[in-house]
Swiss-Prot record:
<dbReference type="GO" id="GO:0005576">
    <property type="term" value="C:extracellular region"/>
</dbReference>
<keyword id="KW-0732">Signal</keyword>
<feature type="short sequence motif" description="RxLR-dEER">
    <location>
        <begin position="47"/>
        <end position="68"/>
    </location>
</feature>
<feature type="signal peptide">
    <location>
        <begin position="1"/>
        <end position="23"/>
    </location>
</feature>
<dbReference type="GO" id="GO:0042025">
    <property type="term" value="C:host cell nucleus"/>
</dbReference>
<keyword id="KW-0964">Secreted</keyword>
<dbReference type="GO" id="GO:0030430">
    <property type="term" value="C:host cell cytoplasm"/>
</dbReference>
<keyword id="KW-1048">Host nucleus</keyword>
<protein>
    <recommendedName>
        <fullName>RxLR effector protein CRE18</fullName>
    </recommendedName>
</protein>
<comment type="similarity">
    <text>Belongs to the RxLR effector family.</text>
</comment>
<keyword id="KW-1035">Host cytoplasm</keyword>
<comment type="function">
    <text>Effector that is involved in host plant infection. Contributes to virulence during the early infection stage, by inhibiting plant defense responses induced by both PAMP-triggered immunity (PTI) and effector-triggered immunity (ETI).</text>
</comment>
<keyword id="KW-0843">Virulence</keyword>
């Protein structure tokens, strides 16, 4: 019974608020549909909404340049950041990645030669009980740091391939055949 009463009360309130007499009496309150909301001919809608007083002259130059002043201030603050960003982008695009690639691949391509004695020596070191690069470095196996860095690259490639083989993914190795030929170490090598 109480649900029926509440439904009737909601319906009555809705009917009373949507009647034409109520809408006509609320006309000055409703600013969107009221006559005070209309803009004069030639005046911008934005400026009309911003006017604070009725007597304010909306055609003053300050009203026109309000947004421009704010944007100029933002540009003034952001100009150093834009310069730094442009310099960083120019620096990053000036050195092309393909010009650096041969330098980085040179040491790996040398190891890919099957007749390379260093490659064979790296294989023997890797297959020994102490194949870890840091252990071999402590033992003094490497003459130069460049030789150590080449062995570390060799070691990383071998370790990832053994991980593929031990996980049962040797037929679908994560490396491409070209990479296997270049480095000279496959999953079962």
């Amino acid at each position: 019974m109480s649900k029926l009463f509440y439904a009737f009360a909601v319906l009555a309130v809705h009917v009373l608020t949507s009647s034409p007499t109520t809408a006509a009496s609320n006309l000055p309150v409703n600013l969107v549909t009221g006559p005070a909301f209309t803009t004069p001919a030639g005046a911008a809608h934005r400026r009309f909404l911003r006017s604070i007083h009725e007597g304010e002259d909306s055609l003053k130059p300050s009203a026109f340049s309000e947004e421009r002043t704010a944007l100029r201030a933002m540009d003034y603050l952001l100009k150093p950041k834009h310069k730094k960003l442009a310099a960083a982008l120019k620096k990053s695009t000036s050195k092309h990645k393909l010009s650096v690639a041969p330098e980085k691949m040179k040491s790996i391509q040398v190891l890919g030669d099957p007749k390379n004695p260093e490659r064979e020596w790296f294989k023997r070191l890797y297959n020994s009980k102490r194949g870890d690069p840091q252990t071999l470095r402590k033992l003094g196996q490497f003459k130069t740091e460049a030789q150590l860095s080449r062995y570390i690259k060799f070691y990383v490639v071998c370790r990832t391939c053994i991980a593929c083989y031990s996980s049962g993914r040797s037929d679908s190795c994560h490396r491409t055949p070209r990479m296997v030929r270049t480095v000279g170490v496959g999953c079962r090598d």
